[in-house]
From Swiss-Prot:
Disulfide bridge map: none
Family to which this protein belongs: Belongs to the ClpS family.
Organism: Shewanella oneidensis (strain ATCC 700550 / JCM 31522 / CIP 106686 / LMG 19005 / NCIMB 14063 / MR-1)
Lineage: Bacteria, Pseudomonadati, Pseudomonadota, Gammaproteobacteria, Alteromonadales
Designated name of the protein: ATP-dependent Clp protease adapter protein ClpS
Role: Involved in the modulation of the specificity of the ClpAP-mediated ATP-dependent protein degradation.
HAMAP family (UniProt xref): ClpS (MF_00302)
SUPFAM superfamilies per the UniProt record, alphabetical: ClpS-like
GO biological process annotation, one example: proteolysis
InterPro entries the record matches: ClpS, ClpS_core, Ribosomal_bL12_C/ClpS-like
Superkingdom of this protein's organism: Bacteria
Quaternary state and interactors: Binds to the N-terminal domain of the chaperone ClpA.
Length: 102
Protein backbone atom coordinates (compact mmCIF):
# COMPACT_ATOMS: atom_id res chain seq x y z
CA UNK A 1 0.00 0.00 0.00
CA UNK A 2 1.41 3.34 -0.99
CA UNK A 3 1.55 6.43 1.09
CA UNK A 4 -0.31 9.46 -0.07
CA UNK A 5 1.18 12.72 0.96
CA UNK A 6 -0.57 15.95 1.55
CA UNK A 7 -0.30 18.19 -1.43
CA UNK A 8 -0.12 21.82 -0.57
CA UNK A 9 -1.17 24.31 -3.13
CA UNK A 10 0.88 27.37 -2.76
CA UNK A 11 -0.30 30.35 -4.64
CA UNK A 12 2.17 33.08 -4.97
CA UNK A 13 0.43 36.34 -5.30
CA UNK A 14 2.32 38.55 -7.60
CA UNK A 15 1.28 42.10 -7.33
CA UNK A 16 1.99 43.95 -10.46
CA UNK A 17 2.20 47.64 -10.04
CA UNK A 18 0.40 49.44 -12.77
CA UNK A 19 2.58 52.22 -13.96
CA UNK A 20 0.90 55.25 -15.45
CA UNK A 21 1.64 55.59 -19.17
CA UNK A 22 4.43 57.88 -20.29
CA UNK A 23 3.01 61.25 -21.20
CA UNK A 24 3.91 63.36 -24.22
CA UNK A 25 3.52 67.06 -24.98
CA UNK A 26 1.93 67.87 -28.31
CA UNK A 27 3.68 70.96 -29.66
CA UNK A 28 2.76 73.40 -32.42
CA UNK A 29 5.78 75.13 -33.96
CA UNK A 30 5.78 78.66 -35.34
CA UNK A 31 6.36 79.40 -39.00
CA UNK A 32 6.20 82.57 -41.08
CA UNK A 33 3.34 81.48 -43.34
CA UNK A 34 0.50 79.82 -41.42
CA UNK A 35 -2.23 82.36 -40.56
CA UNK A 36 -2.94 82.91 -36.88
CA UNK A 37 -6.63 82.17 -37.47
CA UNK A 38 -5.74 78.74 -38.85
CA UNK A 39 -3.67 77.94 -35.74
CA UNK A 40 -6.64 78.95 -33.55
CA UNK A 41 -8.91 76.73 -35.64
CA UNK A 42 -6.53 73.76 -35.21
CA UNK A 43 -6.45 74.27 -31.45
CA UNK A 44 -10.24 74.38 -31.28
CA UNK A 45 -10.85 71.38 -33.55
CA UNK A 46 -8.15 68.97 -32.41
CA UNK A 47 -7.52 70.05 -28.81
CA UNK A 48 -10.99 71.30 -27.83
CA UNK A 49 -9.72 74.69 -26.72
CA UNK A 50 -12.17 77.53 -26.37
CA UNK A 51 -11.49 80.73 -28.28
CA UNK A 52 -9.58 82.41 -25.44
CA UNK A 53 -7.41 79.36 -24.69
CA UNK A 54 -6.68 78.88 -28.39
CA UNK A 55 -5.75 82.55 -28.79
CA UNK A 56 -3.44 82.43 -25.75
CA UNK A 57 -1.64 79.32 -27.06
CA UNK A 58 -1.41 80.82 -30.56
CA UNK A 59 0.23 83.96 -29.14
CA UNK A 60 2.70 81.81 -27.18
CA UNK A 61 3.56 79.97 -30.40
CA UNK A 62 3.95 83.28 -32.24
CA UNK A 63 6.18 84.92 -29.61
CA UNK A 64 8.14 81.93 -28.25
CA UNK A 65 8.40 79.79 -31.37
CA UNK A 66 6.33 76.91 -30.06
CA UNK A 67 3.47 76.15 -27.72
CA UNK A 68 2.04 73.17 -25.87
CA UNK A 69 -1.40 72.11 -27.08
CA UNK A 70 -1.85 69.36 -24.52
CA UNK A 71 -0.23 66.44 -22.71
CA UNK A 72 -1.38 62.93 -23.58
CA UNK A 73 -0.36 59.25 -23.48
CA UNK A 74 1.83 58.37 -26.47
CA UNK A 75 -0.86 56.82 -28.67
CA UNK A 76 -3.19 59.78 -28.35
CA UNK A 77 -0.36 62.30 -28.78
CA UNK A 78 0.91 60.53 -31.89
CA UNK A 79 -2.58 60.44 -33.41
CA UNK A 80 -3.11 64.16 -32.78
CA UNK A 81 0.25 65.01 -34.38
CA UNK A 82 -0.63 63.00 -37.49
CA UNK A 83 -4.12 64.50 -37.72
CA UNK A 84 -2.91 68.09 -37.31
CA UNK A 85 -0.08 67.69 -39.83
CA UNK A 86 -2.46 66.11 -42.38
CA UNK A 87 -5.04 68.86 -41.83
CA UNK A 88 -2.39 71.55 -42.28
CA UNK A 89 -1.15 69.99 -45.54
CA UNK A 90 -4.71 69.57 -46.83
CA UNK A 91 -5.17 73.29 -46.25
CA UNK A 92 -1.78 74.10 -47.82
CA UNK A 93 -0.15 75.40 -44.65
CA UNK A 94 3.35 74.47 -43.43
CA UNK A 95 2.24 74.32 -39.78
CA UNK A 96 4.25 71.63 -37.99
CA UNK A 97 2.97 69.65 -35.04
CA UNK A 98 5.37 67.46 -33.06
CA UNK A 99 5.63 65.67 -29.74
CA UNK A 100 8.14 65.54 -26.88
CA UNK A 101 8.23 63.42 -23.78
CA UNK A 102 6.67 65.34 -20.89
Amino acid sequence: MGKTGNIEHVEERVESELMPPSMYKVILNNDDYTPMDFVIEVLQIFFRKNEQEATDIMLTIHHQGKGICGIFPFGIAETKVIQVNQFARQNQHPLLCSLEKA
